[in-house]
Amino acid sequence: MAVNENEIGTVQTQATAPAPQPTAQRQAQRPTGAPGSTTGINHLMRRSGRLDGSDARSADALQVFTKVKEEAIRHQDLPDDFDIHRFDRDAQQVGMAGLLIVKLAKDINGSMKAFVRTLVLDNLPGTRIRPRTHKINNGLTDDIIEEKVLPRDVFTAQYWSKIGEFLRNRYNIPGLEVLSAGPRAVYADFDFKDELAVKNLLVESVNICEDAIARRNNETPFSIATHIKAENEQLTCNLDYNGIPVKDSCGNPIRSDMVISTSRGKKTNVPENEFYDTDSQLNQVSLFVDLHWTPTTGQQQGMFGVTLPGAALPPQFTPYIVITDVRKASWIQAWTLEMWLFALGNAYRATASQAWARTLMPKIATSKMRDIGALGYYSELGKAIETRTEAFMADDSNFVMLMNKMVNQNPAFQIDIDPMGDNSAIEQVILDAAGGVNQARAVSLIFQALTNLYGTDFRQFYNLAEAGPIIFDNHHEVDLGHYTDEHGELSDRRDLDVLGAMNMSEGNDQEWKTWYATQVGNDHIVRRMNNSKGFDKMYLGNVTYTGRARRLTFNPKFITAMDAAAAAAGVTVTMENLITNFGQQRFAGYTGMGNMAVSGSAQVGMAGSMGQTYGAPSYNAPGTWY
């Protein structure tokens, strides 16, 4: 849902509702179909039995969630101050059923509100629901394309309006304002028998409702100047290259070629309490590097501005660092826009000593799709380069030479926004900032959050009039889902990126470019994504699709402005395992960057030192209103 002018993730509902009825009648009441329509047959001519079982999943979900709620309250993991409501598909005449996690609370003005996290339950296979049908002209005739209905297609203004009406009747409070704490899709393969997973989803949902309540009541926002201020502490970043996918709250794998985690710990030579003052992780951001084909002409300039010998072509590919997941540490309960932006900013640490490039280094055990040697198809050689050999991997300079020759050395930054994901309430603000009727309000909220976070007016670091929008929407949508990889493990469908398709097409230029056109071409988006699924089937096998994300591109000036604001706030960041050189050569400093590529690299200290402090610490900067 869109950002409301008064509240992040707020969705205004009608101010009045039908007069309340006795509880027994309210629970039995079912809306009827429109006069003369077939949708209301089962409501007008009701019978007891049913075969489609379309609401059985919501009944099962409610039973398990209620059981888990009672246990969590008994163990004092949750307070007994929230409700769980079943929102039936048939009773409400909506495309998918849902569970509503609801907290009633008064706002700062004493007005009672309902804060709702909506868990939209994806239909099980075989459930009666009409696919979306598109008629798209191809120049001569029309293509008829059927598209599976996703939870995000169902969670519309009409769906939300019905939730508001349902809750006003349920609580018997006419005029109750119902505010969204963000939707979450629960896909068909989620196992409600896994009570630990259900508990995590429930606790997360309750906390997200409380995040919305706290924001509505002007809670003092998270601030580095306020919350990370001990002079004997420092922030440390750890780079993890193991490539194991992280999981979302529903157990779906998320591509994580690099995970950058931020922790707060004691500075060197400062004694610690062995059992208490251990490093505390604060957040983490997951990413991978997609190499986009950006063919150019002319000679290639390598390190130090030297023309590389024998290079007839400049680098043909530009790295895009794609952020796939932003999350807090599990021990932290609150999750606000300030905290999300704090975690996001650490993605820029991947530029330190070109750390992002290490995600592309060849490894014998990695998937064929990750073989950087496929870049050779678009070099003077015209064929793949053998990189997964002991001879190639014995000397890092081989990798450095290949990267210098084929890849621009300043990356751009992108992020995948899932409007039905774990961070839907926060990330809707980012999506709105990329365009639409709420853009100005969303950008204002982000600037205020960054001011709160760093203790200095963010406009000092980023001038909108001069720098332009902070993020761009090129209407690039990405299917979310998972497949079984060659090791028998569930993996993220996004493994099939530009390099992956290049490897799978095995040098067939026409096939690879046809695949590429399904990702970033100018064709109708529905037809592109339908054709993309055909390549998924060819290259990945059976794919379970769970949703769709919008891939946005950050303005590079915004990324560097966040880093500058952190430096001015006196943030000390030490990189624990940063490797600065590949063999004897460093892959850094190429001056020819694309329009969206960042220049320079993140300001960090090195492990083993006291860290590097930029600017004077401002530990007592006041938190500002939000």
Swiss-Prot record:
Q: Where in the cell is it found?
A: Host cytoplasm
Question: Which stretches does UniProt call biased (Low complexity)?
Answer: 12-32
This chain belongs to which protein, by name?
Chimallin
Q: Does the keyword Kinase apply?
A: no
**What's this chain's function?**
Self-assembles to form a proteinaceous shell that encloses the viral DNA and compartmentalizes proteins and DNA during viral infection. This micrometer-scale compartment contains narrow pores and is the site of viral replication, with the proteins involved in DNA replication localized inside. Provides a surface for docking of capsids during packaging. Probably protects the viral genome against host defenses.
Keyword DNA repair among UniProt keywords: no
Subunit structure, briefly?
Homotetramer. The tetrameric protomers further assemble as a square grid.
